[in-house]
Every structure is written in C-alpha cells, then in structure tokens.
Amino acid sequence: MTWRSAWFGTVALALLVALSSAAAAEEEKIRLGEFIPESAPQPAPETGFTDADGKPASFADFKGKPVVVNLWATWCQPCLKEMPSLDRLQSQLADKLAVAAVSEDRAGPDRVGPFVAAMGLRKLKIYLDPKSDVGHAFNVRGLPTSIVIDAQGRVVGRVEGAAEWDSETIMAVLKPFLESSSGAIKDAAR
C-alpha cells in the first residue's frame, strides 16, 4: 500500500466519522421536546425529595395516578419557558394527572419559593431536590427533562428539552396513560 492510499483511507474514514456525528447530532436535535417512550417500562426509582415545605416525598406518593415529573432549575431558560404550560396542564387535568415540578436548584426553598411566586404559577406543585438525587436516579442529561410515570408507578417515557405541555401533541401522548389510570384508580378504591 502506498502512502497515497493510506492518506486517502484516513481522509475517507475521518469524513465518515464527521458525517455520522453530524447525523447523530441532527437526530438528537430533532428529538428535543418530543416524547421518547421507554422500550420496557421499569418501576420509578425510590429516590426521595421534599415538598416546598420540606416534608419528605417520593414517587410512591403518586401511585394510582399518572405523574409528569419535571426536573428544572431557576437558572435554566428553557425550563422557565415551559413552566406556564405545566401549570396549565396541572390545572386542566388535576383530577387525572399529577405534575411534580422538581427543582434541582442547590439553594433550595430560599431561591425557589420567591421565584415560583413571581412567575405566578398557581396549580403547579413544587418539590425540591437540591442534591440532584432525582436527576441522577433518572440519568438526566440536561434540564429541563420530564419523566412520565404511569398509574402503576412505572417510568413509561421522557421528554428532554422544553415542551408545550398543554399542546394537542403532548395531550395525545398522555391520553393513553390518563385512560388507563382511571381503571387503576377504581381498582385501588375497592
């Protein structure tokens, strides 16, 4: 093999790697804000966090009702953009769905409480996770990330990046979990 053949092979390989990386980045970009279903739903982690008053909470508290767990922070601009739509979602579906906005801010309630009040969020229930235990348990790569847990307590999918949570697209994604939860809630009441 001559040096020209080796050089050509190296350039071709480098070009192939660059194109593959660009295609993967484009695919990832397209998926931001879209629902990514779990191939095999698993039970939600038993990781604890607290409510805004500092009382312990866990995902078991929501069993029997689907929950959207939104991981966010006050410094995250895309998080702030989607918060009003999460508040509207909770308002529209309060009897069928729980929305848990889990702040990953390290400053805790001193920073989060006034911030939420200033945003005018009225229905959205705020939780705190200053050590990011919830984010680690769900292998979160960035904020915002929202995890959808069904009424049986299984992680069924996620949305990485901001989403318009009260849009027709997201409502269509949530609909099967809302419909299946009504049976689970009835069974739990027996």
How should these model regions be labeled?
Residues 1-11:
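Bacterial N-terminal signal peptides that target proteins for export
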Residues 9-20:
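Bacterial N-terminal signal peptides
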Residues 21-46:
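N-proximal helix/coil linker or "cap" segments that precede and/or mark the start of modular domains
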Residues 37-41, 46-67:
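A short beta-strand-turn-helix
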Residues 65-67, 71-75, 142:
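Short pre-active-site segment immediately N-terminal to redox-active cysteine/selenocysteine motifs
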Residues 80-119, 130-136:
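Structural microenvironment flanking redox-active thiols in thiol-disulfide oxidoreductases
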Residues 116-123, 129-176:
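Thiol/disulfide oxidoreductase modules built on the thioredoxin-like
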Residues 181-190:
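Non-globular targeting/processing and membrane-anchoring segments
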